């Protein structure tokens, strides 16, 4: 089989590889007197094969972003990732990514998951070092390796029972990877010339990869919307900067995997903790006496203190701005969900929202619950949804759409439901105006507490 020579390596990548080559003597010296490591017993391939998987990355810096996280503690980050990921990637390149083999060892000692050594591997000594410090898998980039070099490195990896994530960026590299026997393909969406992102690369290349292989999409996986878009083409995602750049990595991980998700009607600390453990990002606290799940501000403070991993939303039907100001003053409340009925006109809706925002001095986001089956007992028109005498599902949907459009610019999020909410019924999601999808949440029906998920 021919010995393919990689295309001209982009300058940034070439510089990194050139520098990494100068590190090889130091790496060899670092592990010179240690016994041979034991083969790995943790399989990244097995964990990824199930699908809907995430390789979450420990990374403190990158060429495109510079310093990502000043307070970088790989062990602490790994403890968070271990709750959600199928594997953990650890940067080991020191100059551009701030990595080190000690970071790899710290993560391997912390987690039960397989650990990927993320490095620019060009020599077998790097693979032995990776295994010594706890790696269960390595990254091999076809953009910097010939076929012969890949085979040499793959043989060393197999010696230690390490999985290989083979990175590809072109159709030619996909064909090479297939010929080389790769079983985990990492499609890198980043342009190695200018560091830009092209997410169409994943579906374009995925169709050329055999069905029995595992496909991972790398780079540019910034939110749950991207995950949902690319999910049909891949088994999982490798995500680094989007997580380690965030102040709250645990929250960022849940939001990436599940989207913005609110469990409403929490009445106890245990319920809040269960919501967070299930992947929720927000907890809804109901301050409405008519609700069987209503709580007092005192109880709210106890719940909030018990689960700092959630962002809390105060839910009420009140139209009194001063009452909303009192709720916004509760420490830990990050959003106010106005659940009152339609106010009779768009102008009245605007006035209510503006008054609440002014009274709360922008201390919390404003969310508006909107019935996508129209205001209670009515259907409507564009200007005043409550005035129309038309009947039927179509006009009801139009009334809900116009209500949502009327208030969208004045609120931070729309919570879309059927009727007044709490009915356990749903509406046709296709009626959600496309231009509003990015700021909407869907109120879930079913057994309480019901989830509310972002639609993007």
Sequence positions of predicted segments:
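Glycine-rich beta-to-alpha transition loops that act as phosphate-gripper elements at the mouths
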Residues: 59-61, 70-72, 97-98, 117-125, ...
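Catalytic cores of alpha/beta
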Residues: 122-133, 171-180, 220-239, 267-278, ...
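An N-cap/entry alpha-helix motif that binds or orients negatively charged groups
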Residues: 2-71
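Glycine/Thr-rich beta-alpha phosphate-binding loop at enzyme active sites
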Residues: 60-71, 77-98, 177-206, 287-291, ...
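C-terminal helical cap(s) of enzyme catalytic domains, especially alpha/beta-barrels
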Residues: 199-209, 231, 243-261, 297-307, ...
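N-terminal active-site wall of soluble small-molecule enzyme domains
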Residues: 65-158, 162-165, 173-176, 202-205, ...
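Hydrophobic faces of well-ordered beta-strands that scaffold small-molecule active sites
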Residues: 54-58, 88-90, 115-118, 138-140, ...
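Glycine-rich phosphate-binding active-site loops on the catalytic face of alpha/beta enzymes
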Residues: 132-149, 186-196, 233-253, 280-292, ...
